[in-house]
Amino acid sequence: MNARDDTGEATQVRAEDAPPGRGTWRLDLAYEGTAYRGWARQPGHRTVEGLLGEALATILREPVRLSVAGRTDAGVHAWAQVASFVCARRDLRPDRVRLSLNALLPTDIAVTAVSPAAPGFVARRAVSRTYRYRLWLSPVKPVRDRAYVWNVRGAVDTGLLQRAAALLPGRRDFSALTPSAHLYHSYVREVLTAGWRPAAGDDGPPGHAEWAFTITAGSFLHNMVRVAVGTMVDVAQGRMTLEEFAEGMAAGERRRMGQTAPARGLALVAVAY
């Protein structure tokens, strides 16, 4: 099994730097993850990497190896994903490649930009990734946004959500927030920022109350954001205390944390280099 160093990113699976005579290219893309078994190519399953790789091979007439900033899990969305590849051609016409890719890809995947990159650029080497998780705190069903939010039933203390999020920033062992006990060389990560804020729009139905959790880190552990969100909701609904949250984090034990939030509420929203 490959070791990973962020959310689904395998350290032993990496695109090579471009050798002499080959071009390096960057792809910016967005996708709705509902219909996919995540980013990573998996035999027998529909994945974003699988479809994108097939489309690129058709256009370039050669197989390519993709690197990606955030290797999203099944059902997770990405509104600001970055991928890269190297190929024999250095004279690609970016707009034509973008149009051709979008013609071949399904409507829930969109390539927003194709651009030449400096030799040595590899998408997975991002400095930081930002994820956002959306909660719907209303008795009114989120019909329009049902594929992008977690509709939480029952009262939620948003003040406790905010206090729980304040425990996350910093550099420490986050092994309590992943079910993957033997997947990583190190479980130490640095969370740069984390916080909740109301995200209700003026066009919401009566009783509408949407809250969004935004977190930025250099890299993430598998399911780290979803376990954090699920546990914070448990705190906000009285199933565990802030002290138990902090103690579970310090102990590094997944069994002491709360539920795992559904994938549909999570999206990759920014990548920095």
Go through each PLM region and give its residues.
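Structured-RNA-binding interfaces characteristic of tRNA pseudouridine synthases
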Residues: 2-273
